[in-house]
């Protein structure tokens, strides 16, 4: 029997380096992960450079690569992908931005870049979206809430450019920056002016909004300024189904990953960071009943890597492992398990270390690897591959590859 469906499970930031607090083991080596070890034992393993050796991939560029989209061709910035993930219908040529609500004091200085980690911005985001008027520029806006203090902005109109800076000072105690053009074009100068006007009007709307007045009355930071960054022009993507001849869905709590999936035509299945892992797995299984392919991203390991919390990262990997049991009951499934990049706790940042990879399903050759970790997988039968090779290998394993030559 040959597998016929693909699950691409990306444990965000899974790769690591030896951690002293773990006895010089990586979190994967220290974790008790019997299900992942079983997948490794019954499958074929290797290590993978998500983009290329020595390249520290972002979650955006790496996911594009793993889905078969060369980031050197398709990547136009994080902003439009984040905007798509927040539910904005991004069209080619629209300019997308990442956004954060923050708090400024009476002197205009930023005192909290996350507005006291405000849990929900739906109401104030709607007020900004409906209240900001850029019609004198011939520009329409889309503004959508993300999780917590996050949001996304998109601009639509003629003569726009993504070559603009950010108003985010990236520190407290100073005022938000004025947005400037990043090149000498009239389009960049025009877009910078539009962005500054958006920021000015948004701050006026937020200043006395009831939500913020209530937060101040409770002694909480008001969300009274919008910081935008990561400008990018929405590109043109060949759909995943056209490219790979597979129908597909994306299950990801991270807006960026959901946005990447929806941008290439995968159906977005909404989940929240608070959605339990077993419920996310249930949704993945439901989608696999209807679709040929599911991209399933779990994010928290990456966050613990950025925070330098090796013990917590280890425990989270054990939680992921425990949620995987239902996939063993799907004999038609080809499972690929990997990371989009390494996020070592020792450096609290993405690194270029290759990530461990498992391919499990009927039709795979079985190697001698019995553990899922960075060192064990390096001895596997896949050896070392690039992220751009992953989809072609998976398509071959489910007998969807077209012959090259006669």
Curated annotation (Swiss-Prot):
<comment type="function">
    <text>Catalyzes the interconversion of 2-phosphoglycerate and 3-phosphoglycerate.</text>
</comment>
<dbReference type="Pfam" id="PF10143">
    <property type="entry name" value="PhosphMutase"/>
</dbReference>
<dbReference type="InterPro" id="IPR004456">
    <property type="entry name" value="Pglycerate_mutase_ApgM"/>
</dbReference>
<feature type="region of interest" description="Disordered">
    <location>
        <begin position="164"/>
        <end position="184"/>
    </location>
</feature>
<dbReference type="InterPro" id="IPR023665">
    <property type="entry name" value="ApgAM_prokaryotes"/>
</dbReference>
<dbReference type="Pfam" id="PF01676">
    <property type="entry name" value="Metalloenzyme"/>
</dbReference>
<dbReference type="GO" id="GO:0006096">
    <property type="term" value="P:glycolytic process"/>
</dbReference>
<dbReference type="InterPro" id="IPR006124">
    <property type="entry name" value="Metalloenzyme"/>
</dbReference>
<dbReference type="GO" id="GO:0004619">
    <property type="term" value="F:phosphoglycerate mutase activity"/>
</dbReference>
<dbReference type="GO" id="GO:0046872">
    <property type="term" value="F:metal ion binding"/>
</dbReference>
<keyword id="KW-0413">Isomerase</keyword>
<comment type="pathway">
    <text>Carbohydrate degradation; glycolysis; pyruvate from D-glyceraldehyde 3-phosphate: step 3/5.</text>
</comment>
<dbReference type="InterPro" id="IPR017850">
    <property type="entry name" value="Alkaline_phosphatase_core_sf"/>
</dbReference>
<keyword id="KW-0324">Glycolysis</keyword>
<protein>
    <recommendedName>
        <fullName>2,3-bisphosphoglycerate-independent phosphoglycerate mutase</fullName>
        <ecNumber>5.4.2.12</ecNumber>
    </recommendedName>
</protein>
<comment type="similarity">
    <text>Belongs to the BPG-independent phosphoglycerate mutase family. A-PGAM subfamily.</text>
</comment>
